[in-house]
């Protein structure tokens, strides 16, 4: 079971990093000289991606915890495992507590990284809008 969530988290990280690397190319042409910023929306796009990532990871941990709990009771969460496998008396039940702790800390680390990333992006936004132009607060 934990492998599914590892794969999902890796895919999520790959998507986020790909989108970030794709959007950094615009920074060179962000300021067109007249003070108009052609790529002002990048920061908000990144924020949206990060919040989507946070939503996704919280859903993933919720699912992981549900599966861990129902496996402890000998049940089958959302029919992910065929019943003839779960009902076998030979198969020892997985250790759900250990798995839940592992998944939770892993996702917490990821959430922290995403939050830091979001903060970095929001810090850069005002400086990037007019690096050589007048102070953005004085219009």
Curated annotation (Swiss-Prot):
One of its GO terms (biological process) is cell differentiation. GO terms for cellular component: extracellular region; host cell cytoplasm; host extracellular space. Residues 66-139 are annotated as: Disordered. Residues 106-128 have a biased composition (Basic and acidic residues). It is found in: Secreted; Host cytoplasm; Host extracellular space; Secreted, Extracellular space, Apoplast. Transmembrane segments: none annotated. Mimics host plant CLE extracellular signal peptides that regulate cell fate. May play a role in the differentiation or division of feeding cells (syncytia) induced in plant roots during infection. This is CLAVATA3/ESR (CLE)-related protein 1. It comes from Heterodera glycines (Soybean cyst nematode worm).
């Amino acid at each position: 079971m934990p492998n599914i969530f590892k794969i999902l988290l890796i895919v999520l990280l790959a998507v986020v990093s790909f989108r970030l690397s794709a959007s950094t190319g615009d920074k060179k042409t962000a300021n067109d000289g007249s003070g108009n910023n052609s790529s002002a929306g990048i920061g908000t796009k990144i924020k949206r991606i990060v919040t989507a990532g946070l939503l996704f990871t919280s859903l993933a941990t919720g699912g992981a915890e549900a599966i861990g709990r129902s496996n402890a009771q000998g049940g089958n969460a959302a029919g992910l495992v065929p019943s003839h496998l779960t009902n076998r008396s030979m198969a020892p039940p997985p250790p759900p507590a250990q798995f839940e702790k592992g998944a939770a800390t892993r996702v917490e680390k990821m959430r922290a990284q995403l939050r830091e990333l979001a903060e970095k992006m929001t810090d850069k936004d005002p400086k990037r809008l007019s690096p050589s132009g007048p102070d953005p607060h004085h219009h």
